[in-house]
Amino acid sequence: MNHAYTGKKYNYVYAAGAAVKDDVMWGPNQCLVKFNTAPEVGAKAEESVWYFGERCFMQEPIFARKPTGVDEDDGYVLVVVNDAGRDKSDLHVFDAKKIEDGPVATVTLEDHLPPGLHGYWSDVVHA
């Protein structure tokens, strides 16, 4: 989520999702999902999804707000994806408003990054 909304009413959550293999069995995290949690009471939450691929496993998504952003989802979602087929990791950058359009940028990292637990984006530069 946009951490500027921590402790406040917010609408959007970005999550790692499992790709459904069948009605019962779920797989590992292979999808980036954006949920709009603000529909009317009793209505289903709206979602946008991006599937990374058969042997691609994502880590926790991180929201990085645009410095000039106004809306809650004015920013980017950063996701490290481990591609088991290539034994490489990629950093994918998504426009937070349009997850379903796919990444706006992808950087292949020199090394394979093992799955991490949690991450956080800070607007402050620490020297």
Identify the residue ranges that each predicted region occupies.
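Beta-propeller domains
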Residues: 1-127
